[in-house]
Curated annotation (Swiss-Prot):
Forms part of the ribosomal stalk, playing a central role in the interaction of the ribosome with GTP-bound translation factors. InterPro entries: Ribosomal_uL10, Ribosomal_uL10-like_sf, Ribosomal_uL10_bac, Ribosomal_uL10_bac_type, Ribosomal_uL10_CS_bac. PROSITE patterns: RIBOSOMAL_L10. NCBIfam families: PRK00099.1-1. The keyword DNA repair does not apply. Part of the ribosomal stalk of the 50S ribosomal subunit. The N-terminus interacts with L11 and the large rRNA to form the base of the stalk. The C-terminus forms an elongated spine to which L12 dimers bind in a sequential fashion forming a multimeric L10(L12)X complex. PANTHER family: 39S RIBOSOMAL PROTEIN L10, MITOCHONDRIAL (PTHR11560). It comes from Parvibaculum lavamentivorans (strain DS-1 / DSM 13023 / NCIMB 13966). CDD domains: Ribosomal_L10 (cd05797). GO terms for cellular component: large ribosomal subunit. One of its GO terms (molecular function) is structural constituent of ribosome. HAMAP family: Ribosomal_uL10. This is Large ribosomal subunit protein uL10.
Length: 172
């Protein structure tokens, strides 16, 4: 990799660290090409990205970003998973790490908050933004459904009373 490519990569990573909602740092030693491809495709489906990084370049890219504190995590064969959704990248990374012991979550950052491996796991357990939006829409729709049920109830009661009168008249 020549100087221009390194400079371009540092600029790209700086943009990632400055703008990502969350960054997860992990060791990937021992993963096969197929496993890495599988992980990347899972990340893409979730709206996240997974990138193998050179430690020195990643540390340079961290300068001037809110995530400068995670520089110590970049030692050994490291990769980053990142996304705008604060739950997407951690969720996919933790699920993959459960299936494959060779992906070791080291920690990460969410904004200026440094996360250890345990915090990344807790973040992965939270519902995603889409799931939260669906729950909110459901909560908003529930009162409307109940109101419709209450409004329809008197009509149903009237029909049952009339049916009882008709049945009583036939029996007599």
């Amino acid at each position: 990799m020549d100087r221009a490519e390194k400079s371009e990569l540092v600029t790209h990573l700086n943009g990632v660290f400055a703008n990502a909602g969350v960054v997860v740092v992990a060791h990937y030693s021992g993963l096969t090409v197929n496993q890495m491809s599988d992980l990347r495709s899972r990340m893409a489906k979730a709206g996240a990205s997974f990138k193998v990084t050179k430690n020195r370049l990643a540390k340079l890219a961290l300068d001037g970003t809110p995530m400068t504190e995670i520089g110590d995590l970049f030692a050994g064969p490291t990769a980053i998973a990142y996304s705008q959704d604060p739950v997407a990248a951690p969720k996919v990374a933790i699920e993959f790490a459960k299936e494959n012991q060779k992906l070791v979550i080291l920690g990460g950052a969410m904004g200026q908050t440094v996360l250890d491996a345990k915090a990344v796991k807790q973040l992965a357990d939270l519902p995603s933004l889409d799931e939260l939006r669906a729950k909110i829409v459901g909560m908003i729709q529930t009162p409307a459904t109940r109101i419709a049920g209450v409004l329809q109830a008197p009509g149903g009661q009237l029909a049952r009373v009339l049916n009882a009168y008709a049945t009583k008249s036939e029996a007599a």
